[in-house]
Amino acid sequence: MKVSIMNYKIKQLEKSDIKQSIEIWNDIVSDGIAFPQTELLNEETGLEFFNSQSFTGIAYDKNSGEIVGLYILHPNNIGRCGHISNASYAVKKDKRGHGIGELLVKNCLTKAKELGFKILQFNAVVAINTSALKLYKKLGFTQLGVIPKGFLLKDGTYEDIIPHYIEL
């Protein structure tokens, strides 16, 4: 069943959102095919992690309140490169294909600009993440090349990564 993107809104993470957010995040970390992290979050480390970001956005269903996705936004570097931001996105598995990822990325672009960032850069888009690659192309991101075997998959094999950026 296709759900209208109009059913979803994005807000800043609140403490009451931590448990559902950690579940979504950990699901992707456990898959071992998209996020570089290997350690799962618990409520303590999750609260610390999400609160350490410049912004953590939560996509939720306006009718049920269910959290269906999230993003984290933070500086990619420091000092003279501190104007470049980095972000990661997570959509609940059973909610993929409903436009939530696009909603998250668009909100992130706006928020990054509001926070004074000039560029949004993705360091490690895994080549097998075809949905993300298609979305970033649609939204106007530029591919920076390919880093062969730059990502260690959960099964112990390596996959290429494709860094991207967009000027804000």
Name what the model sees in each region.
Residues 136, 141, 164:
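Conserved active-site tyrosine of GNAT-family acetyltransferases
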Residues 7-21:
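A short beta-loop-alpha structural element at the N-terminal edge
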Residues 112-125:
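Conserved GNAT acetyl-CoA-binding A-motif
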Residues 1-6, 89-90, 147, 153-168:
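Terminal substrate-recognition subdomain of acyl/acetyltransferases
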Residues 91, 97-114, 133-138:
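Conserved acetyl-CoA-binding loop-helix of GNAT-fold acetyltransferases
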Residues 34-94, 105-106, 111, 167-168:
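Acetyl-CoA-dependent GNAT
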Residues 23-39:
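Helix-loop element at the rim of GNAT/NAT acetyltransferase active sites that forms part
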Residues 122-132, 150-154:
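Conserved beta-strand-loop-alpha-helix junction that forms the acyl-donor binding cleft
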